[in-house]
Amino acid sequence: MSPFLRIGLSNFDCGTCQACQGEAVNPYCAVLVKEYVESENGQMYIQKKPTMYPPWDSTFDAHINKGRVMQIIVKGKNVDLISETTVELYSLAERCRKNNGRTEIWLELKPQGRMLMNARYFLEMSDTKDMSEFENEGFFALHQRRGAIKQAKVHHVKCHEFTATFFPQPTFCSVCHEFVWGLNKQGYQCRQCNAAIHKKCIDKVIAKCTGSAINSRETMFHKERFKIDMPHRFKVYNYKSPTFCEHCGTLLWGLARQGLKCDACGMNVHHRCQTKVANLCGINQKLMAEALAMIESTQQARSLRDSEHIFREGPVEIGLPCSTKNETRPPCVPTPGKREPQGISWDSPLDGSNKSAGPPEPEVSMRRTSLQLKLKIDDFILHKMLGKGSFGKVFLAEFKRTNQFFAIKALKKDVVLMDDDVECTMVEKRVLSLAWEHPFLTHMFCTFQTKENLFFVMEYLNGGDLMYHIQSCHKFDLSRATFYAAEVILGLQFLHSKGIVYRDLKLDNILLDRDGHIKIADFGMCKENMLGDAKTNTFCGTPDYIAPEILLGQKYNHSVDWWSFGVLVYEMLIGQSPFHGQDEEELFHSIRMDNPFYPRWLEREAKDLLVKLFVREPEKRLGVRGDIRQHPLFREINWEELERKEIDPPFRPKVKSPYDCSNFDKEFLSEKPRLSFADRALINSMDQNMFSNFSFINPGMETLICS
């Protein structure tokens, strides 16, 4: 296998060449590839292949051998212009490797001029030259892990589009007019009108967002419903002390005429915020929101009380008979024991009075509740750190009661809250609780929490992930890649049958057990309730794997998982990503417009599978249209036996013991396994009820954990 560079030359600039003054240059270039050889006369370069004359803005291929150089000569057809430069192909390939497989540079020519050169790195099975020297140098596109991204969650309240925001300067809430405390993303800010608020004040916003308050829908709404139409009387004002805008919450800058002040209510705003302030002069939004909430709760209580009467005044409904009345009342009263236990470990277990309320529960349920409330991080010994990120850390832990080993994923509550990922965390827990129904999904034992952290206790898969293994062998052979792809298909189809779109399929998230079977992990990006014609439009995923319909802002369904599956198979078979770019903008353009490169040595069935997976029309993509199991690449697969794990994997990872960590990145294993410190002020002010339904134990694992 020999790597090669696909090179393009363009944009020749002759500079200040005297011979070019007043003349049309009309240049052309000649490319001479020379080999380094040792001779009796010493070291020298010899040209073994014919000279190439590539047209401008076209491409040509040059294979990489150590010592091989490329001489580029530019000549003029109409003038005496000769410029040249020499490029070492090995150094150019190294530059491409550091820039995600491609590079773009200006070449300075001698004696004058310059030109733009684009180069892209590829692998090909055409030369028989030994590639060991290049393997040692790491000429591969898959040389680092890639993190997922997700569009900020948008809270739509009264036409506002609030997103969690980090305020780099002191900011005040436009609802309660108090300071927005905290680190990271302290509060919400509207993307349309820039109104800043506390996260806790989002339910107290009564003014609709329109960008302008003059004759706005919001003003008309209050005028018709509440008879409120009080425009502010703003006038330019000179502030003698630091003052904050009561709309966007930031400081009014300047020495004079810094902002506007309302003569009636004294509201202070920026000049730029004047047109975005609602006509609510003299109205306290916080108090009005509380009053409206009280009225609503009073009306609900009154309607509930009225429903208990047999006859009603006004428009008459048929009176409910006594038997119906008795049947409808109990659902209004919470049933003891039916509510999911809080599971907060710093609380003491339920006392006897709570246990005696209501009918006695089965013995298994009581054991589960007791264990769920008592389980804490001190029940585990943290041996190694397997990975970490902005979310938290993953540990290899030993359960003290049974001396069994688990992988514990610890999330920091303050980070989850700041990133507005509470619901994503709950989705991950629910998907993991379903994983026991399928052999190729990571199984979760239980979840519990402390005041600072959330913990997922999962099976420890000591075979490592596919990204770790592909970095050592650079690509998988056809039988191995086909086996992994088939097991991933079964896992994806199970998730899709449950109405779950995975949205983060990549090498990093495919783990191996000790026998060599795959397990899909990390369900934090999943979307639930996607059965039938349901679609979503959240922008999320790992950049290299994102489907074009996501980039185009279109609504999508499980079709995006089959595009990501195509990228996964391409990387397993070829050893590099199908789409490239120096930054995300170029990468996304490549995903939308470019066709992947297929080496000549790629098997016909594998290429056909990839072509059908990389169809940009979601409804025509394989997996959405047609049965992917029937593709010729999988003709040797017995799907029933595969799902029962009756087929031996082609590769078995080296595992020395149940707690072996040799298949994980060494950079994490060397760190001390300990929990990160949380923001104490934020933790103390946090509403812990947001995580009240987090704690969970899988019923199928009660005996194992309690033994």
UniProtKB/Swiss-Prot annotation:
Region Disordered, residue ranges: 327-365
The AGC-kinase C-terminal domain, residue ranges: 635-706
Residues bound to ATP: L386, G387, K388, G389, S390, F391, G392, K393, V394, K409
Residue ranges occupied by any C2 domain in the UniProt entry: 1-107
GO function terms (MF aspect): ATP binding; diacylglycerol-dependent serine/threonine kinase activity; protein serine kinase activity; zinc ion binding
Domain Protein kinase: 380-634
SUPFAM superfamilies assigned to the protein according to its UniProt record, in alphabetical order: C2 domain (Calcium/lipid-binding domain, CaLB), Cysteine-rich domain, Protein kinase-like (PK-like)
Disulfide feature: none
Listed EC numbers: 2.7.11.13
Keyword entries, A-Z: ATP-binding, Cell membrane, Cytoplasm, Immunity, Inflammatory response, Kinase, Magnesium, Membrane, Metal-binding, Nucleotide-binding, Phosphoprotein, Repeat, Serine/threonine-protein kinase, Transferase, Zinc, Zinc-finger
Summary of activators and inhibitors of this protein: Novel PKCs (PRKCD, PRKCE, PRKCH and PRKCQ) are calcium-insensitive, but activated by diacylglycerol (DAG) and phosphatidylserine. Three specific sites; Thr-538 (activation loop of the kinase domain), Ser-676 (turn motif) and Ser-695 (hydrophobic region), need to be phosphorylated for its full activation.
Residues carrying Phosphothreonine: T219, T538
Chain ranges passing through the membrane: none
Modified residues (Phosphotyrosine): Y90
Cofactor: Mg(2+)
GO biological process, any: positive regulation of CD4-positive, alpha-beta T cell proliferation
Zinc finger (Phorbol-ester/DAG-type): 159-209, 231-281
Function: Calcium-independent, phospholipid- and diacylglycerol (DAG)-dependent serine/threonine-protein kinase that mediates non-redundant functions in T-cell receptor (TCR) signaling, including T-cells activation, proliferation, differentiation and survival, by mediating activation of multiple transcription factors such as NF-kappa-B, JUN, NFATC1 and NFATC2. In TCR-CD3/CD28-co-stimulated T-cells, is required for the activation of NF-kappa-B and JUN, which in turn are essential for IL2 production, and participates in the calcium-dependent NFATC1 and NFATC2 transactivation.
Domain free text: The C1 domain, containing the phorbol ester/DAG-type region 1 (C1A) and 2 (C1B), is the diacylglycerol sensor and the C2 domain is a non-calcium binding domain.
Similarity-based family: Belongs to the protein kinase superfamily. AGC Ser/Thr protein kinase family. PKC subfamily.
Protein name: Protein kinase C theta type
Organism: Mus musculus (Mouse)
